[in-house]
């Protein structure tokens, strides 16, 4: 059993005392609708940009999760006034005039990449930043390197290239830097969010391809909505950000498309029907490209003006290979439902997910193998063969990884007796995940 980092769990984690969950197959056809929580990606971007602005911004539909909790707590320690009232969050930005402080960022990858540049724009101040055990194993050097080129003073406190670290406020001079997005697009977004506060324009020359490049567009669109002046080509080879401070805004945040995919997969897997009440296909969140994957597997998808609906089929179709590079957070979702297809499914171009909260390729291969499913693991993906998963004697480990937990839970809606350790890890992005499953008729036992 893999121990989780309890310090990274926030008060917004609802399953603090729950060690395992057991899921049970549906007794009847799934036919329901849900309202999804807000987007984690948009929430943390909007919180930090609002804090960088001067005066009051309002966010509606903010996600309340571990990652957003640590973002809010860090911003408060920096002197930002934030008030969360139900679905509405007000932020009084201070233009980057941060208080010196020691900060803890939990396991929040977005916060780890976005906050660093925001601190670097300050003309004075000192900060030490600690991260969770898992986040401290994920490299930050690509972003630190370009921030140093632009004038930032950053020192690693233990291991070179990883959290924890300290930063001294020098401001950013501006200029041209080269940055790769092949490991994570968040390095690029982290620099972009800070760039309007540099002394001169910041030009980013992107080296190679960008994994999940749509998230960079998401960052750019949000920056522009807060008044940033940005120029870029559609291939994102060169991005220029001009010195223009953000202006306060009132923003309605979309629902989380990544979370949506688990519920769409649930309907696909159980020959059910589900309607997502607060998400449309017009979203720029890349994970919703999974809709075309579900259609490829035989499902019927309705893209409404205010909803998305999916209806499953009695036999999912397999027998294909697919690059999941642009929606790599859903590689595990597809792997989890792949055993129930009528042919093998090969997932490629996701080597970078080996460096997330867990080595996701290795972990999902291990779990499926334990369940009796044949898998072939390779450097940038895996092939999953059809089969009937069989419950294991001991609970499956979730490896303190929310995407592992949510993906494996789908199998539990088809196979009796599947148990998962540490279900509370879902609070990183969707604290209410298991409650939403129960709302849809899935029986969940908490132990």
UniProtKB/Swiss-Prot annotation:
Record-listed 3-phosphoshikimate binding positions: 40-41, 45, 184-186, 329, 356
Name of the protein described by the UniProt record: 3-phosphoshikimate 1-carboxyvinyltransferase 2
Transmembrane residue ranges: none
Keywords associated with the record: Amino-acid biosynthesis, Aromatic amino acid biosynthesis, Cytoplasm, Transferase
Signal peptide start and end residues: none
Gene Ontology biological process terms, A to Z: amino acid biosynthetic process; aromatic amino acid family biosynthetic process; chorismate biosynthetic process
Predominant place of localization: cytoplasm
PANTHER family with a match to the protein in the record: AROM/DEHYDROQUINATE SYNTHASE, PENTAFUNCTIONAL AROM POLYPEPTIDE
Catalytic reactions on record: 3-phosphoshikimate + phosphoenolpyruvate = 5-O-(1-carboxyvinyl)-3-phosphoshikimate + phosphate
Enzyme class name: transferase
MF annotations from Gene Ontology: 3-phosphoshikimate 1-carboxyvinyltransferase activity
Pathway stated in the Swiss-Prot or TrEMBL entry: Metabolic intermediate biosynthesis; chorismate biosynthesis; chorismate from D-erythrose 4-phosphate and phosphoenolpyruvate: step 6/7
The protein's Enzyme Commission number: 2.5.1.19
Source domain of life: Bacteria
HAMAP family: EPSP_synth
Record-linked NCBIfam families: aroA (TIGR01356)
Active site: 329
Record lineage: Bacteria, Bacillati, Bacillota, Bacilli, Bacillales
Annotated compartments: Cytoplasm
Function: Catalyzes the transfer of the enolpyruvyl moiety of phosphoenolpyruvate (PEP) to the 5-hydroxyl of shikimate-3-phosphate (S3P) to produce enolpyruvyl shikimate-3-phosphate and inorganic phosphate.
């Amino acid at each position: 059993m893999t121990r989780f980092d309890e310090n990274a769990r926030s008060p917004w984690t609802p399953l603090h005392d729950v060690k395992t969950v057991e899921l049970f197959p549906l007794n009847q056809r799934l036919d329901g609708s849900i309202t999804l929580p807000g987007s984690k990606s948009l929430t943390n971007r909007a919180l930090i940009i609002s804090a960088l602005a001067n005066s009051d911004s309002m966010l509606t539909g903010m996600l309340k999760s571990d990652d957003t909790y640590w973002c809010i707590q860090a911003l408060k320690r920096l002197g930002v006034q934030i008030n969360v009232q139900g679905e509405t969050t007000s932020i009084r930005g201070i233009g980057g005039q941060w208080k010196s402080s020691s900060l803890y960022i939990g396991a929040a990858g977005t916060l780890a990449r976005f906050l660093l540049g925001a601190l670097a724009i300050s003309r004075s101040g000192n900060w030490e930043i600690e991260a969770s055990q898992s986040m401290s194993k994920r490299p930050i050097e690509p972003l630190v390197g370009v921030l140093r080129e632009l004038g930032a003073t950053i020192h690693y406190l233990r291991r070179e290239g990883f959290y924890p670290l300290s930063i001294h406020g020098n401001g950013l001079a501006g200029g041209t830097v080269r940055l790769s997005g092949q490991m994570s697009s968040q390095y690029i977004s982290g620099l972009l969010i800070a760039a309007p506060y540099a002394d001169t324009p910041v030009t980013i020359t992107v080296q190679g391809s960008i994994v999940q490049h749509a998230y960079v567009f998401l960052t750019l669109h949000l920056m522009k909505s807060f008044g940033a002046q940005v120029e870029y080509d559609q291939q994102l080879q060169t991005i220029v950000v001009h010195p223009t401070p953000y202006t306060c805004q009132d923003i309605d945040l979309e629902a989380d498309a990544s979370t949506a995919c688990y519920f769409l997969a649930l309907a696909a897997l159980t020959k059910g029907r589900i309607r997502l009440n607060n998400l449309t296909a017009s979203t720029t969140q890349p994970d919703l490209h999974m809709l075309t994957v579900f259609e490829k597997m035989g499902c019927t998808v309705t893209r409404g003006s205010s909803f998305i609906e999916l209806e499953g089929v009695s036999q999912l179709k397999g027998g294909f290979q697919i690059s999941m590079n642009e929606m790599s957070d859903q590689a595990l979702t597809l792997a989890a439902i792949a055993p129930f297809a009528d042919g093998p499914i090969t997932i490629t171009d996701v080597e970078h997910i080996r460096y997330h909260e867990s080595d996701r390729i290795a972990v999902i291969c291990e779990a499926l193998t334990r369940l009796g499913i044949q898998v072939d693991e390779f450097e940038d993906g895996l092939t999953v063969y059809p089969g009937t998963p069989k419950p294991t004697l001991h609970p499956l480990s979730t490896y303190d990884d929310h995407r592992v937990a949510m993906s494996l839970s789908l199998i539990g809606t088809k196979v009796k007796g599947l148990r998962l350790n540490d279900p509370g890890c879902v609070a990183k992005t969707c604290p209410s995940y298991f409650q939403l499953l129960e709302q849809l008729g899935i029986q969940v036992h908490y132990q």
